[in-house]
Amino acid sequence: MIAPEKLLEAAKALEPQLQEWRRTLHRHPEVGFDLPQTKALVKKALTEMGYTPQDCGKCGVVALAGGKRPGKVILLRGDMEALPLQEESGEEFSSELPGKMHGCGHDMHTAMVLGAAKLLKEHEDEIEGTVKLEFQPAEEIFQGSLDMINSGLLENPKVDAAVMFHVLAGMPLPAGMVLVPGGGITMASCEQYHIVVHGKGGHGSMPNACIDPITAAAHIHIALQEINSRELDPAGFGVFTTGRFEAGKTSNVIPDSADMWGTIRTVDPEQKVSALIHQRMTEIAQGVATAYRCTAEVEFSDYCPCMVVDTPLAGNALTYMTELLGKEAMDMTPLTGGKPGGGSEDFAFVSHEVPTVSMFLAAGNAKEGYTYGQHHPKVRFDDSVLYRGTAAYTYMALRWLAEHQ
């Protein structure tokens, strides 16, 4: 098997190509499952490397490396889609599409896995098993991973272990550092909620002749905070946030309805906390609405489970990343105290099916000029770390397969 230092050199030599892939994707961001240009770039690159990429699900792509020697199967995931966000980063390769931006670094992930695909193809005879390369859409809406699983992602050949990386910007970490979590739940579950409050609209000068849904919705929003502060265990983790509130279109008209959208996050795999939040949100929304002569509908959707990291696989990952990067790979447990993060990731669906590890790659901090974090319109990512991500994906696959015959 190729030595770690030689692999890093080979990955470093790919840097111009990695940056070209990443910056092309960054200029042309696409969201959700609607990724025609992104998918075309991925399939073209894979085909030119000698792969036969296959469609998987609504918009996913998979390809296989190795398979010439018997062994297990390891999955490497790169998500592809952008956010519905207006870019303000100031990068020379900023989004050319209004209202769309690679603000979470998925362009980086796609480029890194394409780089790994190239290195794996060049060392295909050394692969003791099979590497399945996954390019996933719709992570941001928590639908892409499950769609690909339902379309056979983990079968033919059957996957034995799964790996993902996520870049981090704006964190106080040296660029290029790899963080490996311990085992157990590392990220929260997430689901969407939508509350519609129905009243009776009319002229703003005659509120007495109307039933104002805005007033009712505002009181519902305030009343819901009691669930967080008075009904959930302070020692646990359960939080919901209303991030969008819409009502009316004109300043002098009381509308017929008001809408609220938000997210619920917990770290309870049995969903008991989620069930309590569902019950109490519905009771409070409908009860407060009634008090203000309105009605309320509450809907929950797009559930994504907690991310569960396999403890033995995480141990393998820390060993391999240390072999590759030395002190620039670290156990992130001292940073987190072993507690799950509040963010969510739909690769969690895979983690409930096969042993999985989700790692992080630092891609710029404030001292280096990378001030903003993910999902901010001004976020920037240091793409000089791409080769490290490519090397990390590649080494993880080769090393794990060699050790798990």
Functional labels for PLM-detected ranges:
Residues 2, 218-405:
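Metal-dependent amide/peptide-bond hydrolase catalytic core
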Residues 2-102, 107, 111-128:
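Acidic/His- and Gly-rich active-site-bordering loop/insert found
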Residues 25, 63, 76, 106, ...:
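Divalent metal-coordination and catalytic microenvironments
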Residues 26-28, 102, 106-109, 166, ...:
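Histidine-centered active-site/metal-ligand motif
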Residues 77, 86, 193-195, 358-364:
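Non-cysteine beta-strand/loop elements that form the S-adenosyl-L-methionine
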Residues 83, 90-101, 108, 120-255, ...:
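Histidine/acidic-residue-rich, glycine-tolerant segments that coordinate divalent metal ions
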Residues 85-92, 184-189, 317, 364-373:
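Short, flexible, mixed-charge acidic loops at enzyme active sites
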